[in-house]
Amino acid sequence: MKLTKRNPILVLVNDFVIDSPLPTNLTYFWNFGSLLGVNLVILIISGLTLAMHYTPNTLLAFSSVEHIMRDVNNGWLLRYIHANGASFFFIWVYLHIGRNLYYGSYRSPRGLLWSIGVVIFILMMATAFIGYVLPWGQMSFWGATVITNLLSAIPWIGTDFVLFVWGGFSVDNATLNRFFSLHYLLPFILAALVVMHLLALHQDGSNNPEGISSSSDRLRFHPYFTSKDLVGFVWMAILLSIFVFFAPYYLGHPDNSIPANPLVTPHSIVPEWYFLPFYAILRAIPSKLGGVIAMFGALLILFPLALIHTNNVRSNRYRPLLNLLFWIFVFNFFVLLWVGAKPIAQPYILIGQISTIIYFLYFVILMILGCIMTYIYTKSNCFFIYFFLYFGCSIL
């Protein structure tokens, strides 16, 4: 008997990496999960090494980052890999989510798998935000001030909660220490959630481009899909190397190369590029509380997708209307990303408000179209059709 069949630990590795059965028609769009796993390992290793030389003190944080860049052997390489690796991590995540939205991978029986993935997405956004504060540059300080101030919109306890997060009356040394501790801890929680994500995937099985069950037409993960994943790893290494060695600051903000100064406000306060779509949604609502609700709602609306999607057909490739709707949603997401980087002025405010409406309207139309198509295919009634008809007539 093979060693991989006898050792309890190697049995798990064998079940997940070698003998795991996967549908034969998986495309390169199913590479993003493995890319994310490798990227997370790179981020954790580079982050742990950087933490050995970083000083979480407002007077020394910026200087310690410069010390890493100038004095630590290959410190510049570690920092560039960590910073640009975080950007690539979000690129793979957005592509991963987009593929799941297109092919309906959130549908039963993968509801738990999808929910764990959304939790990972929200937690990694929190991890990235507090990590962006650590260099203690100008944009780090003011970004932390603006974003943490959003918590004051919570009724009754908002102001006290902000002071609790700050550890004082402003973003200062206590805040930086708290953020450093959390940024050190959260990646390991992320890794634990990733393991849960893999367990759920192993339990429910992977989706495929057809969106139908393929239990009888499967191949082993190794060597058929490991070779496919290796191609993705090579491309990721090439793309990441281009940014690390030739354009390390391209995805960052130049103001963060200036030490934090509480007395000088930057001309425009913007977060990292991967937060911009949700930052645009936040700014689109004039009310502070309304903006916070809309921003978090844009993330939390991903949880009930399995309930919103009422069509019996899982994949969008066989539904022309939903296919068109999906690509409108993708284009609108890029519009939100573009608007989020622009100053708060017209016409960007109006464009952001329209794009925000389109963002949420996608999920409403997804539900209505699903009901209509289900009725056409099966002649069965849908509760949501009656609900929206009643709601629309009530408004009129």
Curated annotation (Swiss-Prot):
A ubiquinone binds at residue 202. One of its GO terms (biological process) is mitochondrial electron transport, ubiquinol to cytochrome c. SUPFAM superfamilies: a domain/subunit of cytochrome bc1 complex (Ubiquinol-cytochrome c reductase), Transmembrane di-heme cytochromes. Heme b b562 binds at residues 82, 183. Signal peptide: none annotated. The keyword Metal-binding applies. It is found in: Mitochondrion inner membrane. Its cofactor is heme b. Keywords: Electron transport, Heme, Iron, Membrane, Metal-binding, Mitochondrion, Mitochondrion inner membrane, Respiratory chain, Transmembrane, Transmembrane helix, Transport, Ubiquinone. Pfam families: Cytochrom_B_C, Cytochrome_B. Fungal cytochrome b-c1 complex contains 10 subunits; 3 respiratory subunits, 2 core proteins and 5 low-molecular weight proteins. Cytochrome b-c1 complex is a homodimer. Belongs to the cytochrome b family. This is Cytochrome b. It comes from Spizellomyces punctatus.
